[in-house]
Amino acid sequence: RDVERSRGLGDVYKRQGVNQLSKKHACFMFFTALNDHGTKSSIMYEKSKELFGSNPNLFEPNWIVENLSENDAVELISKKIGAQYPQQLAKSWLKNAEILKEFYNSNPIEMFCSSNDATKLIATLKSFRGVGTKIGGMILRAIIGTGFNKNVFNIEKVLVPVDIHDSRIMFLTESFVINNNEKVNYYKYVDIAQTEILKACNRCNINWLDVDRALWLTGSNGCVYDKCD
């Protein structure tokens, strides 16, 4: 979710001549989000920023397709940004660059704006390799939050991109309660949390994008590991 930080472009971007809401900005945001698997978002973001600063071509779909093999992607990308699953990230990086080149003129912005209907846009995002409900929802939130597409509607029909931290928060706040003394398997309740948080937002007429930001702040900084127990 730290990919939204890229709306406030830092020195790395300025040195590379990157303007806010430009194609390069979109490429960085899209490819960075692909690595949000079991990695603390702030660390992921910083490593991706360093990689972009040293070699922005690694985020350019045309260049990726024409120049990188899977082994290259593992060595030059996955290992540099500390991917939990280096081979899988490399496969996703290459495959998704191919999709962007073939269907969106190598420009993620065309994909971001391919529909204003959130349900269709999330379906498009999830058609990319390695993008499921969580990462798709995270990218959707970033697309809206950064301003790449300000006309998205039906957001209330898209599930909130939660993870184990959000599930843990639900129990910590007693939004979820189970009637036994066994240690809770928080992973088991992630999907339920996703559905219930969306229902609560819709009942209260609250945009889940705002709730998701609050949950991320709590989950990533205040409710991690033994801090929640």
Pin down the residues of each PLM region.
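Single conserved hydrophobic/aromatic residue that forms the stacking wall/gate
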Residues: 2-13
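Extended cationic-aromatic binding surfaces that line active-site or macromolecule-binding grooves
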Residues: 14-72
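Conserved aromatic-histidine-acidic binding/catalytic patches
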Residues: 18, 22, 36, 81-88, ...
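Short, hydrophobic/amphipathic alpha-helical patches that form generic packing surfaces
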Residues: 19-43, 95-98, 141, 168, ...
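Short runs of predominantly hydrophobic/aromatic residues within well-ordered alpha helices
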Residues: 22-31, 89-90, 136, 162-163, ...
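A general alpha-helix detector
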Residues: 29-33, 76, 120-124, 165, ...
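Alpha-helical ds-nucleic-acid-binding substructure associated with the helix-hairpin-helix region
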Residues: 52-146
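Accessory, usually C-terminal, subdomains that scaffold auxiliary metal cofactors
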Residues: 143-229
